[in-house]
Amino acid sequence: MAQSTTSETHTRDLDRDCTTLSRHVLEQLQSFSPEAQDLAALMQRIGLAAKLIARRLSHAGLVDDALGFTGEINVQGEAVKRMDVYANQVFISVFRQSGLVCRLASEEMEKPYYIPENCPIGRYTLLYDPLDGSANVDVDLNVGSIFAVRRQEFYDESHEAKDLLQPGDRQIAAGYVLYGASTLLVYSMGQGVHVFVLDPSLGEFVLAQSDIQLPNSGQIYSVNEGNFWQWPEGYRQYIREMHRREGYSGRYSGALVADFHRILMQGGVFLYPETVKNPTGKLRLLYEAAPMAFLAEQAGGKASDGQKPILLRQPQALHERCPLIIGSAADVDFVEACLAESVP
């Protein structure tokens, strides 16, 4: 009996180690069609970008030009970190010759990067935040990368990328990479949320958890309370209520990926409200809020801008910003109720 149990354990371990990103995508799509193979290859390329960024981060204090600022200001009006530039270039380099995408849109670029005509051109667009929470790099805290995959809706001859201005429910895949104690890649193609861990000995992302489900509620709220007096009253009302409730904890790291991953695993809610300084919100809709909302809903949670689901919000611009309330369904509902009650 003991030998049988040991054998079954070894079989499960081998099955897990053999479930790589590309294999998992093909299993999810239940197809070996050219489109399915392209999506599997695309996800594998995202994994390659993650490995390169993870390697650079692990040597951040030992190599030149990894820490600190470049002295430039990006399209968002934010000071550019050296690792922002590196991570953005990694994604471009990984996909330029891949034949999988026609363009890439990033937080770090005012306009999308179009694959040159002398390179193979694919049918997909990758939208991404190359290094979320990059202010954490210099103090060795968690950071991440966020991505979303969309089909090209029509031929973009004018290079205005207007077909990208579609609600988040048009995404065909979304996910993030968390660079921390281990490197995790979390993704969904509309069939649940799945977690992969980078195994350094194999050099591969292997499946760690399938079909993650967000608890209906949790006892964690994640928000930068330093902005308390800049928020609309409904958010302040919610925080006051959390302070009164026993057992609730505030956790905030400054990286959306890290904070959302905690919520995904343990339940609760992440908030990034609009403020007096940023009346339309701070997070970017297309490559931060919408990908995370896609994951939250696939895991049984919710994501809202305070008035409507994030995935139903119609973007008007590539770098459009929005408020974000995301996490366990009951907790998001409660925040929305606080906002509704505060409206005169």
Curated annotation (Swiss-Prot):
Biological-process GO terms, alphabetical: fructose 1,6-bisphosphate metabolic process; fructose 6-phosphate metabolic process; fructose metabolic process; gluconeogenesis; reductive pentose-phosphate cycle; sucrose biosynthetic process
Coiled coil spans: none
EC number: 3.1.3.11
Cofactor requirement: Mg(2+)
Classification via Pfam families: FBPase, FBPase_C
Matching CDD domains: FBPase (cd00354)
Binding positions (Mg(2+) 1): E107, D129, L131
Activity vs pH: Optimum pH is 9. Activities at pH 8.0 and 9.5 were approx 67% and 85%, respectively, of that at pH 9.0.
Binding annotation for substrate: N224, Y252, K282
Cofactor, free-text remark: Binds 2 magnesium ions per subunit.
Role summary: Catalyzes only the formation of fructose 6-phosphate by hydrolysis of fructose 1,6-bisphosphate.
Family: Belongs to the FBPase class 1 family.
Assembly behavior: Homotetramer.
NCBIfam families per UniProt: PRK09293.1-1 (NF006778)
Protein name: Fructose-1,6-bisphosphatase class 1
Species of provenance: Synechococcus elongatus (strain ATCC 33912 / PCC 7942 / FACHB-805)
Gene encoding the protein: fbp
